[in-house]
Amino acid sequence: MDQFIKQDETGDLIETGMNVANHFLSAPIQGTNSLSKASIIPGVAPVLIGNPEQKNIQHPTASHQGSKSKGSGSGVRSIIVPPSEASNGGTQIPEPLFAQTGQGGIVTTVYQDPTIQPTGSYRSVELAKIGKERMINRFVEKPRTSTPVTEFKRGGREPCSRPDNPRGGHRREWSLSWVQGEVRVFEWCNPICSPITAAARFHSCKCGNCPAKCDQCERDYGPP
């Protein structure tokens, strides 16, 4: 059996398909009736007669949309799926690169070495890699000549926590961004009881034990 389609058969198939398309384009649209058996010309495409009715799904007309129904309505409601982090609450920081007055947080810039200027299509990638390394090195403590001795006092107040509940406190968060050839870092504090999100957000205390400000974020608001 020959599995190849001849050139004249290809032309007939194309012509048949064009006739079917022109028929549906020229026929008036009458809701679900436009796909009934009566709307298809006999002999044009017999295989299309049974398929449309199997796939036909009735939808409410436009006149029912937006109307209020009494009791349990059978209309279709649109479902809006919120972002995955919407349930976490908090106030999203619209522009974490520039701290607003009274908002809290510090913006610092990791300057690049002027002698290192990569070129080519991977310039931004190389500069970002350099900025990331310098950003990480900022938080690496230098070697100490002597071992520090911490004096423990029972009942003493821990940093960033209330004396009645040492579990409450703040955690420091950072957001790195690449802006105009330099790496900018925005850092701020959030209560430790708040969730950690991918987007930069300010959260409020949920447990009631976290202070409004801690030793780390006092400098975020400037001088008192």
UniProtKB/Swiss-Prot annotation:
Its keywords, alphabetically, are: Host cytoplasm, Host-virus interaction, Inhibition of host innate immune response by virus, Inhibition of host interferon signaling pathway by virus, Inhibition of host MDA5 by virus, Inhibition of host RLR pathway by virus, Inhibition of host STAT1 by virus, Inhibition of host STAT2 by virus, Interferon antiviral system evasion, Metal-binding, Viral immunoevasion, Virion, Zinc
One biological process term in Gene Ontology? symbiont-mediated suppression of host JAK-STAT cascade via inhibition of STAT2 activity
Any one GO MF term held by the record is: metal ion binding
Q: Can you supply one Gene Ontology CC term for this chain's record?
A: host cell cytoplasm
Region (Disordered) residue ranges read 54-98, 145-172
Q: Which InterPro entries match?
A: Paramyx_V_Zn-bd
Q: Where does Zn(2+) 1 bind?
A: H170, C189, C214, C217
Cellular compartment(s): Virion; Host cytoplasm
Q: Bias category Polar residues: which stretches? A: 54-65
Q: Which domain of life is it from?
A: Viruses
Write out the biased-composition intervals (Basic and acidic residues).
151-172
Positions annotated to bind Zn(2+) 2:
C193, C205, C207, C210
User: Major location, coarse class?
Assistant: virion
State the Gene3D superfamilies in the record: 4.10.80.340
Subunit info? Interacts with host IFIH1/MDA5 and DHX58/LGP2. Forms with host DDB1, CUL4A, STAT1, STAT2 and STAT3 the mumps virus V-dependent complex (VDC).
| Functional summary from the UniProt entry | Plays an essential role in the inhibition of host immune response. Prevents the establishment of cellular antiviral state by blocking interferon-alpha/beta (IFN-alpha/beta) production and signaling pathway. Interacts with host IFIH1/MDA5 and DHX58/LGP2 to inhibit the transduction pathway involved in the activation of IFN-beta promoter, thus protecting the virus against cell antiviral state. Blocks the type I and II interferon signaling pathways by interacting with host STAT1, STAT2 and STAT3, and mediating their ubiquitination and subsequent proteasomal degradation.
**According to its UniProt record, which protein family does this protein belong to?**
Belongs to the paramyxoviruses V protein family.
Name of the protein described by the UniProt record = Non-structural protein V
Q: Which organism is it from?
A: Mumps virus (strain SBL-1)
